[in-house]
Amino acid sequence: MKLFDSRIWTRPALLVVAVLAVQLLLPRLQAELGYAPLSAAVAQENEEAAPQPKERETRRTPALRNKVYEKLAEAQAAAEAKDYNTAAKILDDMIASGGKKSLNSYELANVYNLYAFIHYSREDYNKALKAYENVVSQPDIPLAMEMNTRFTIAQLYFVQENWQKGIEALLQWFDMTENPNANAYVLLSQGYYQVKDYDKALKNVETAIDMYKAKNKLPKEQWYNLARFLYFEKNDINKTVDVLEELLTYYPKKQYWVQVSHMYGEQQKEKEQLAAMETAYVQGMLDKGTEQVTMAYLYLNADVPYKAAKVMDKGLKDGSIDDKSKNWEIAGSAWRQAQEVEKSIPAMEKAAARSDEGELYARLGNIYLDGDQHKKAITAINKGLQKGGVKRPDNARLVLGMAYFNDKQYAKARDAFKAAGRDERSAKYAEQWIKYMDSELERQKKLAEG
């Protein structure tokens, strides 16, 4: 009999996605948005080469004149010193002195680029976005500058949780990029994840993972997590397991042992389910009481009650498993199944004492009977019946009759058997016990008469 169904708690465990775009983008943008008016490089993570333009189109980019360069450098110094008011005033004066027409397209693009940095630093993302849009609207700016800016625009939309516009901006960047790197594919995947287009999200994160594998590089843990979640959402259990097994190869953490155990359960691979959870347990990873209880259930399902009992006993003693009736009941039942009646009794005593109903006292009485403690069995079962909530009072009264019989309280035993026999489910057994008791009493009478 299967005691435990992992599906009840599989979904909550796997719905947590370790990577969300908005959580990752803001710190990255803060690191990347340093203003460099003379630089055309796309900000990238150190381990990846900067993407190149898809086509080497010829652009006649105007020169940056010395007097404009000097003003931009002055504004940049103020911005880097966090004197944003002074930086903005310098830029305002540059435009006001001769109007926008006094600046060529490249100079104006650099002015808007620095405006965007100032607005971003002030956390005014709407104005920052508008300024960046003004950068890319200028004709004949360097391709690398346009690529960098379009990528930043996409990131800012994601920071604002404007997922669809972020996706559209990022796709524009992809269109003009010859060799998008893996991080860009992950960013696009996160955008699609947020708009619940899981197929496209999965395609892009898998592309990123494959790109790293092709270079013999270890894909990032967050990427695997995003793929894992997306496969689970598509109800592709086999692929979810594949990803979890890869995670365990490179990032052998507790959460992945627990999750893959759940997934093996979904695949009805009970041996693998137990082995995965046991691996986490023996390494001391299962520090939560609920996880230890799950471990015990898996042992019980596998007909290894002794190990289940040991898990429960250890957790209850060290306090990691909650001191409540249900947990003591599991421990007591496991010890009993393991034929350890003496250890089962104190656990079930605690379970019964903490329960609001009499069922556990009835079960405790049964265990007392197994241990030949007949008087205690009588007391426990009567207490359970008086308390109420016994699932099968007829069964409890049968056991009560046996305890009275073994304690030589024959009249009370007869009453208990008769009471049990009023329920048709126990009538046959009650009648058999009464006949057996009558024959035994007759035998004892004849022996006494000599």
Regions found by a protein language model. Give the residues of each.
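N-terminal leader/linker segments that initiate helical-solenoid repeat arrays
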Residues: 3, 26-133, 144-148, 425-450
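Alpha-helical adaptor scaffolds
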Residues: 325-339, 345-394
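Generic helix N-cap/helix-start motif at coil->alpha-helix transitions
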Residues: 64-73, 104-112, 142-152, 177-187, ...
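Solenoid-like repeat scaffolds
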Residues: 57-63, 96-104, 136-142, 171-179, ...
